[in-house]
């Protein structure tokens, strides 16, 4: 009898602690929120300044570091050369070195082509497409913001 009372209270306590942990996690996630277009453009400008100061090699390394200075909430930097080769990727570093010019999203949209074409014309976005959110691992609508800096296009996307 005593065992069942203790077991029941222990189970209830575990449920309560689990609930509280989930609630705190949710509050933290809600407080951090999604990055905004203004945040994305600021991160692009910060990366461009770093590129001018530190050069391509250090910038590509830092932008591909998942714990680096160019990761903010759900924002990360991707840098392409003018042909669509990934020079840096903050969320999926294994894409570095691959040419993704012909990559398409789940709706068959050639989003990298569109980003590079618009960047060549001096535009900064947005290009809308679908991509996997780095924190939730779910497919989501995304808007890419970008800036051409010399021979590179620095991009950062906001999830909707």
Question: Regions from the language model: what does each represent?
Answer:
Residues 5-7:
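Acidic, Ala/Val/Gly-enriched low-complexity intrinsically disordered segments
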Residues 9-11:
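Charged/polar low-complexity intrinsically disordered segments
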Residues 2, 13-17, 29-160:
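N-terminal membrane-sensor/transducer module of prokaryotic signaling receptors
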Residues 18-26:
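Bacterial N-terminal signal peptides
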